[in-house]
Amino acid sequence: MAAGVPCALVTSCSATFTGDRLVQHILGTEDAVVEATSSDAVRFYPWTIDNKYYSAEVNLCVVPSKCRVTAEIAEAVQAFVVYFDSTQKSGLDSVSSWLPLAETWLPEVMILVCDRVCEDGINRQQAQEWCIKHGFELVELCPEELPEEDDDFPESTGVKRIVQALNANVWSNVVMKNDRSQGFSLLNSLAGASRSVGSAESCQCEQEPSPTAERTESLPGHRSGACGPAGAQVDSIVDPMLDLDIQELASLTTGGGDLENFERLFSKLKEMKDKAATLPHEQRKLHAEKVAKAFWMAIGGDRDEIEGLSSDDEH
């Protein structure tokens, strides 16, 4: 493994689905290049993440068992993806044995993967409760429930969601790109992410009251009707903390492209996504529409460009 290259550690706790197979799904190829190792136990799949915001060279590191985790690998881990067999009632037991290691790595991204939840094994409630307790996100490769076709902000599922989460991570060797004008697309892609967000914060944290009423009144989306730089009115948003979130998003998106700013941007988006994930489906759709519109106005976007965002502009 090349020194200084961060890795996403991938492992499988299933006898019928290997970590290599999961990596091949992530890379979108059955012929992924494998870096040879002396023991042939740990395998490294080089992956270049190249999106509109940054590029980074990472390794998808397949580790078959805990005893194969070397000090070098442990130091490089920045994401943890683990597959389990949901058809077995004890399916989560073997995953739990990895928790002490995960707690020492403290990766920003931790994903629990299965083919789909199983009523005769580990059902959805059990999987989600485990994820919430331990800070994971649940991703089903072949979920029975797919996003509705008429959803304006469809939730990503399966391998697409895994790739999305890995792209949203701020890798230690990230190389930023100059174009910082795509915040609206970023918000769209992340605001409606997986309904199975496994973060304790997503279900337990409570928002504090707005610091000052005066600040709230000056922000986009206030009940009285606020104007962004483009001078257009945006829909009313009741929660004053959401106003503050949008203001901060706008500031981060139009600010400098330094790593600290970028990391805070993704952190804020995840906070807002986690909060939205706790809402009922219809409220979540409306919430996402309002956030997207208010954010677009806050960074000086043209209202004409988002007129078709919702099928019902009256909400």
Swiss-Prot record:
<dbReference type="GO" id="GO:0005829">
    <property type="term" value="C:cytosol"/>
</dbReference>
<keyword id="KW-0597">Phosphoprotein</keyword>
<dbReference type="InterPro" id="IPR019341">
    <property type="entry name" value="Alpha/Gamma-adaptin-bd_p34"/>
</dbReference>
<comment type="function">
    <text>May be involved in endocytic recycling of growth factor receptors such as EGFR.</text>
</comment>
<keyword id="KW-0653">Protein transport</keyword>
<feature type="modified residue" description="Phosphoserine">
    <location>
        <position position="311"/>
    </location>
</feature>
<dbReference type="GO" id="GO:0015031">
    <property type="term" value="P:protein transport"/>
</dbReference>
<protein>
    <recommendedName>
        <fullName>Alpha- and gamma-adaptin-binding protein p34</fullName>
    </recommendedName>
</protein>
<keyword id="KW-0963">Cytoplasm</keyword>
<comment type="subunit">
    <text>Associated with AP-1 and AP-2 complexes.</text>
</comment>
<feature type="compositionally biased region" description="Polar residues">
    <location>
        <begin position="201"/>
        <end position="210"/>
    </location>
</feature>
<feature type="region of interest" description="Disordered">
    <location>
        <begin position="201"/>
        <end position="229"/>
    </location>
</feature>
<dbReference type="GO" id="GO:0016607">
    <property type="term" value="C:nuclear speck"/>
</dbReference>
<keyword id="KW-0813">Transport</keyword>
<feature type="modified residue" description="Phosphoserine">
    <location>
        <position position="310"/>
    </location>
</feature>
<dbReference type="Pfam" id="PF10199">
    <property type="entry name" value="Adaptin_binding"/>
</dbReference>
